[in-house]
Amino acid sequence: MPAMPLLAEPPEWNAAPEPAPPRAVGQSVLGNTLNLYGARRANLLVIGGVHGDESEGIFLAHLLLAAGCAAPLIPCLNPDGALLRQRWNRRNVDLNRNLPTPDWSAEATNPRYPPGAAPASEPETQAFLAALEAVQPSTILSLHSYKETFIEIERPERELSAGLNAAVLDYAAAAGIERRQSIGYPTPGALGAFGRAKALLVLTYELERGRSHGELQALLQPLRTLIARLDGERFVAP
């Protein structure tokens, strides 16, 4: 697939160790290969690029890949949307409304969030489900961007172990960001609802839109520490 200008390698990437060969878990609508790096059974799966126009999350995911991510990683789940610079996939479906959840509905809550013809109708969603089957994680970290920076965990603190709570709170304090339990509006067919239905812990990391590459690079090392801590402990739903 053509290289995205956004993902041109900064010079310092040249010294990074070459990542292990990826495992293909599917193809996009346009036939782009959807790769899972570091494929193994693990406590954590990291995903970037669910929404193609959220370039900050995609860039940070590729930084993680180049630096060596402690957990299995899909750096860009929606390469077609990234190339087209749009939120949706090539069929104009919001992949974060296309997951098979109890609350999935064919009726969009907003024209911006088209859910697709059926749950998991999109090949990118099917690739994500294949990655889940391969990794068997208990926690998912999804990298997005929004008008402000925060980490959303759709579970109260009491449902997390002391270790997992500490990992998130330490990172939030170090990065100066807020922890939230909800984005504030209904999201049927989204990853949070999927996580609740499947007894998974889902962390959605919203990066402020418009952050420079340098600002995103400054987040890399603290985020690698968070990922190592999340991968070091298995979440058990109450």
Question: Whereabouts are the PLM-identified features?
Answer:
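Active-site-adjacent mobile loop/cap segments within catalytic or ligand-binding domains
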Residues: I151-E152, G184-P238
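Active-site/substrate-binding loop(s) of hydrolase catalytic cores
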Residues: Q27-V29, R40-I177, Q181, E208
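Conserved beta-strand scaffold positions in the cores of enzyme catalytic domains, especially
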Residues: P22, L36, L73, I140, ...
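Short glycine- and acidic-rich boundary segments immediately preceding or forming the N-terminal edge
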Residues: M1-N35
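Short, electropositive, low-hydrophobicity segments enriched in small/polar residues
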Residues: N35, G52-E56, A61, R85, ...
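Active-site beta-strand termini and strand-to-loop segments that position acidic
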Residues: Y37-R41, R196
